[in-house]
Amino acid sequence: NIIVQPVIFEKIDSDAISKSAQNIHGSGGPTRIDADTWKNMICSKAHGSEGLQLGDEIASLSKRLCSEEIPYEHISSLMSCRLVPLKKLDNSVRPVGIGETLRRIISKAVVSMLKQDILCASGCLQTCAGLEGGIEAAVHSMREIFENNQCEAVILIDAENAFNRLNRQVALKNIKQICPNLHQFLSNSYSNPANRGCSKFCEVSRIPINHI
């Protein structure tokens, strides 16, 4: 087994959390605490030292999520999401899960710190993993292929959401090998079913759903 040294996560500090909070947008999860509210609590100078202390505490939680196996009952509220029903063209309903803003802040800070690890793990197969100009390069490459008179091709558009079809346990097992520094954080986040709240009922998600 690959041993991950917790010291690598020391870069996640109050400043990293503040930068992450400044780049978060959108509504809140079950607590309804949206991005603007968290941004104000963490980044506003009006709160003085309390904002810095909050950033430090969130950073400490982030580092624990990256380096320790935390009992799920201790973080189940953080991993919960609020379901919003979206009406589709065929009049059916598609549930979209809105996760807690705090979880998104932590995730962004962790991903930012492990950017190079994620880039190495995903390679050229995933242009959305942080590779600069990756999507633009892919578009230009396809254009060159189509404009080549010697080329005959058909492009098949993958319109399905791969995250919805993902087997969590298999994915976590693979991540442990190809990106070990990220494994514990993802394991704490996705090993257990997430509570999904919608109106007056709550159900448990055993398969992935869309997260905002």
Question: Which residues are covered by each model-predicted region?
Answer:
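Conserved pre-catalytic core of RNA-dependent polymerases
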Residues: 3-212
